[in-house]
A protein has these predicted regions:
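Conserved divalent-metal-coordinating catalytic cores
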Residues: 1-168
């Protein structure tokens, strides 16, 4: 931290005996990650969503598109092929939409590979052009899905400065 004059991310491994430092890099701090002013009296019809849990600071300028995978519609799909097709469609949109000018919003854990009911099955290449990756945890009865908090793609998201937002 002192040498880089910034907070750092450390990655290390342990074999049970020795601890190995794998990577050390400065965390990025740009104006876009600084707290943004929040309007006090925004009409409800102008709100896309509101959060009642912790959400990171900042602003994301120049958004032109929102790709929204409806959690109810996704949850109603019964065939694995249909669920996989949703991820493939997201991948095609990722290539077509202007880089860093769109938001991806969808149910559960983005990047789910085994149980695709847990979230949209994508690879990093299917989401790498987005400005924001937003995971929606929608309660079904007593069940509240556990979100990945970007862990499937964490280092890629950090390096590309793609914002991650969990929405409960």
């Amino acid at each position: 931290r002192d040498r880089l004059d910034s907070p750092v991310d450390l990655e290390f491994a342990c074999d049970g005996e020795d601890l190995y430092l794998l990577q050390c890099r400065a965390q990025s701090h740009t104006e876009e990650f600084a707290p943004a002013p929040i309007p006090r009296h925004l009409p409800r019809e102008l709100m896309l969503f509101s959060a009642h849990r912790s959400i990171s600071n900042g602003r994301v300028p120049d958004i032109t598109h929102i790709v929204y995978v409806d959690p109810d519609a996704y949850g109603a799909l019964s065939e694995r092929a249909q669920l996989i097709a949703v991820g493939e469609t997201v991948g095609r949109l990722n290539k077509l939409l202007p880089k860093r000018q769109f938001i991806l919003m969808g149910p559960g854990r983005w990047g789910s590979r085994g149980d695709v009911k847990l979230g949209v099955s994508v690879t990093y290449a299917d989401i790498n052009n987005t400005a924001v990756l937003l995971e929606i945890a929608k309660r079904k009865g007593n069940y509240l899905p556990e979100l990945s908090f970007g862990t499937h793609f964490f280092q890629d998201l950090v390096e590309a400065e793609i914002r991650y937002i969990p929405l409960y």
